[in-house]
Amino acid sequence: MKDYLEIVDVVARQILDSRCFPTVEVEIYLEDGTIGRAAVPSGASTGMYEAVELRDGDKDKFLGKGVLNAIRNVNEIIAEELIGCNVFEQTYIDKMLIELDGTNNKSKLGANAILGVSLAVANAAANSLDMPLYRYIGGVNSKVLPVPMMNILNGGSHADNSVDLQEFMIMPAGAPTFSEALRMCAEVYHTLKKILNDKGYSTGIGDEGGFAPNLKSNQEALDVIIEAIGKAGYKAGEEIFIAIDAASSEYYKDGKYVLEHEGRTLTSAEMVDFFEDWVNKYPIISIEDGMAEEDWEGWKLITERLGKKVQLVGDDLFVTNTERLEKGIDLGVANSILIKLNQIGTLTETLNAIEMANRAGYTAVVSHRSGETEDTTIADLVVAVNAGQIKTGAPARSERVAKYNQLLRIEEELNDVAEYRGRKAFFNIK
């Protein structure tokens, strides 16, 4: 097997993401003619500790959202250092990119510039070996297909409606295979659309493909999902479970949780009561960002109360950052980390975060962003690290479906070796 192949050219360009904003795409050219390509996603609700996404700020072009400065950083600064490097030295290249930037949040070159290069390098290396990306990243034991954490109802900053919480999702943990899990989700999605139509609600969709109706309350979102699961022919709490992304940092103001659409302002303890009440009433298996990113005491409380029976995912809390994750582990908060490549900015740092989480007994959920492209790297990544869970939107909008379709291909390729862990993917809760 090859172990040395030089990078001969690096090209970055500005393309559009699924929200019609510019993003960075990078191509890496190798001496044998191989090309590797990667496109970078972008978030709507972002944690304050995320690596910095470099935007131009020129209001005359793309409302200030252009990424030409990030493109220039790749084509001029990064390319000069990268050309001549061995494409198989991923760790060395990522370290070089971090040092070239020189800041603790990648604000000089931009995490979008750095991530585009990091992922394109990995894709180029895999392509040169004629090897699937998941196999190149993860090795021979990469075989676990993920349980989808599928967004079917949107609220918060992902939709323009009356729901405070950001995402209501379904997880087919009772399915026997990934392909069956996807079918179950698709059927619930279509059933939910009919239910919403029959109730006179809009079936317009949000950034991630979930429906965004003007429901009367946050709880009504759970009720219509339970109805959809049943009418689709499945048992809630046995075959299909509910997951929530509360994105609570978005409505955390002056130390309180302000649920504007419900006209309620809650303390941390009351917010935990709010979720505990839901967990007792509904088959909720996972809550993401139930507490705000700076509410460490709230996180301690929700972990003490719910951490043995519900997956508590830190997204804004951890931002795929090993320093934040280490603090959380030391404090005993949450029991899972959401993995978003662009929160930290390189493949190596992402893999380090997953490894740290696994060592501490935390689950890892590999995730998309609300602004996505047709890039399917995260589908390969989730299999590469045997994470067992993926969050990549509804079975609608092609930038979301692209990831699911790639996972179907991987499942087919792995054939009898493919493993769908279902309920066992939640190994640290009862």
Curated annotation (Swiss-Prot):
Highest taxon, organism lineage: Bacteria
Gene Ontology terms, MF aspect: magnesium ion binding; phosphopyruvate hydratase activity
Subcellular location(s) of the protein: Cytoplasm; Secreted; Cell surface
Main location: cytoplasm
Reactions mediated catalytically: (2R)-2-phosphoglycerate = phosphoenolpyruvate + H2O
One GO BP annotation of this record: glycolytic process
Official protein name in the record: Enolase
Encoding gene (name): eno
